[in-house]
Amino acid sequence: MPSSDVEVVVVGGGAAGVAAARRFHDASVPCLLVEARPRLGGRAWTVTDQSGFALDLGCGWLHSADRNPWVAVAQAQGATIDKTPPPWMNRPLEASFPRSEHADFRKAFDEFYARLDEAARRETDAAASTLLDPKSRWNALLNAMSTYISGAELDRISLKDLDRYHSTDVNWRVVEGYGTLVSAYGADVPLMLDCTVDAIDHGGKRLKIETSKGAIAADRVIVTVPSAILAAERIRFGPALPKKIQAALGLPLGLADKLFISLQNAEEFETSVRLFGHTDRVATAGYHIKPFGRPMIEAYFGGRCAADLEPGGEAAFFDFAVSELVGVLGSDFAKRVKPICVHCWGSDPFALGSYSFATPGFADCRQTLAEPVDGRVFFAGEACSRHDFSTAHGGWLTGIAAAEQVIAARGG
């Protein structure tokens, strides 16, 4: 154990925690990063398949790349940034979505977001599903899209919160993996892995942080664990922090799981094309064919569909994917695909989901969650971001903001 007494402890080694700890390290502020997993990165996790390809099981896109601080980190690390337009910016495969129908869907999509923008200006909040046109044939697909974007269906999501998300529509990727990027950025900071934080006592002159490897005394702490972990009270606070728990309950984690599938005779397809299994139901996956030009498919499952499949593991996801793919591409297509890997984020004990959304009426919980307690207990993470929630750069920005608050509180 590096130290049982340190000035600042950062709890959680995801994007927010790594960014905060690195800021302290660079400012020569004594800090210890404590992470429950045997690795850094949190919900940014890259694995390597048998062909040597880096696969992002968690976040994979440098969203709003023209203002995303992880881009500069990637450049400094010498990582390869792929600026190929994302598949959702292109027209889907004709076999799954004829051109005329896709144009009609895009119109419905744009009209929905126009209604969202108008409704968000009103004082009252409501579920985003109230903005669906009851006569539209595209409501199921709009809902399916919501499960990829937010990890949840529109009936569960605050329209005000959804409208507050800011995107520049510039989306890049890191060939070596987003998870690789995040974990490497924290490699030089003092840290403890495989160490859960069970309780934080902030009632005394100094903080007492109870971990699976013993107690740590500290002056200040930044808590960066996912909102679902706080809501489940996996970390006990003394004195209790009921406002934080209530805020976290209003910011549940949606679910978005990715299944990677190997593809034979991939040259038949263009690079980075997309198809939907179905365009007339919510429980459908989105399929990104040949990402980076690789002979594989990234299959995206979200919301209740992903939750229903998780108990069955990789086999359930693959069976679902094959049934949809053969429906679009023919029965022989089943012979060309094999599962590579999937990670079930909802079943992950240190995440309990993928990324946060606000439930109707709870959009302002992000600010409540982000507020420090007595100038000693600080909070960060994508769920604390008003405009960049659900992203690794949202995690970074809140982590840096919390670190700067700590530095200011200690007088430089």
Predicted regions located by residue number:
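FAD-dinucleotide binding site
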Residues: M1-G412
